Design a protein with these regions (language model features):
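Transmembrane beta-strand segments of Gram-negative outer membrane beta-barrel proteins
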Residues: 43-62, 81-83, 188
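Flexible, solvent-exposed coil segments and beta strand-coil junctions
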Residues: 45-53, 100-112, 154-165, 204-216, ...
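Short acidic/polar hinge/loop motifs at secondary-structure boundaries
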Residues: 2-26
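N-terminal periplasmic accessory domains that precede
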Residues: 7-9, 22-23, 33-55, 68
Length: 287
């Protein structure tokens, strides 16, 4: 998961449920992660319990925005069920003032510009996890993580002595991930996950320049990613406190990306793009 999703989980996880957090600048091979990683280990409950939390936040900066987050956990000696959900209503606005002086062919050009940026959207984060303990050493767990930002609207308005322009952008993002893991009592770990990501956007631009010329275009684009990964790791204890670990992993990904322009007027260089990539990575064994 990315940094934003990890932050959401950390904000919705009670402190008393965290056993430890490992920060690794170079993750070992059995984590199947390239580069840095953060591993959060939660405590296992050995009794019957139910706990939950609800929190809310509010902010006013040009607009009223805020959100609500909640989580609950039901556990028994054999199983545990977790649900985390957060909904945030995001409204942003900022101003950028530009006063720039450029010299071109010995002539000084003074450019004054004011830009207003606005964003408005709802962001939803969901995580559902289930863990079942066959005994003290064997367990299986499955987790679903989702992040949704439907109907995001961004607007940029620019005015000044060089141009007056308006850009409207509409975005719809979705990410879903499901993970399955099995931990055995004899050191064998088997797991896999599937990630689905899609992003669709539509954009309209109109610009009116100081010299009387105009330009405009409409654009639609999108990206769709399907990624599958599986792994198997084995750990063995040796004499004198040594451990031996080895395993294998495989990952396959499909990435579809496109961008198409329409209703282009004025002196604007546009290029339609399309790509459909398939990639197999991390097919390797490690010791």
């Amino acid at each position: 998961m990315d940094a934003g999703q990890l932050e959401t989980i950390l904000r919705n996880t009670p402190v008393n449920r965290v056993e430890k957090v490992e920060v690794m600048y170079s993750a070992p091979p059995e984590y199947h992660v390239r580069g840095a990683a953060i591993n959060m280990i939660l405590k296992h409950s050995n009794d019957y319990s139910f706990q939950g939390e609800i929190s809310a936040n509010y902010k006013n900066q040009y607009f009223n925005d805020g959100g609500m987050n909640g989580n609950f956990r039901l556990s028994t000696p054999k199983m545990a069920f977790d649900v985390m959900y957060g909904a945030n209503n995001v409204k942003k606005m900022e101003y950028i003032d530009l006063d720039s002086k450029h010299t071109l062919k010995g002539e000084l050009h003074n450019i004054i510009q004011n830009e207003q940026l606005r964003s408005k959207y709802w962001k939803h984060d969901l995580r559902v996890a289930f863990e079942y303990n066959f005994n003290n050493k064997n367990n299986i767990n499955i987790a679903y993580t989702g992040s949704y930002t439907p109907d995001q609207y961004n607007n940029s308005r620019t005015s000044g002595n060089y141009q007056t322009s308006n850009v409207d952008k509409y975005i719809d993002n979705q990410m879903r991930n499901i993970t399955l893991q099995y931990h055995s009592g004899f050191g064998l770990d088997i797991g896999g996950d599937y990630t689905y990501y899609t992003s669709n956007n539509a954009q309209r631009l109109y610009a009116d320049y100081q010299d009387g010329s105009q330009s405009s275009f409409s654009m639609v684009g999108g990206q769709k990613i399907d990624r599958y990964s599986i792994y198997a790791d084995q750990k063995q204890s040796l004499s004198k406190g040594w451990n031996l670990g080895y395993g294998i992993s495989y990952r396959f990904a499909k990435d579809l990306d496109f961008q198409t322009y329409d209703k282009v007027t004025g002196n604007i260089q546009t290029q339609n793009t399309y790509s459909n990539l398939r990639e197999q990575t991390d097919r390797k064994a490690h010791v």
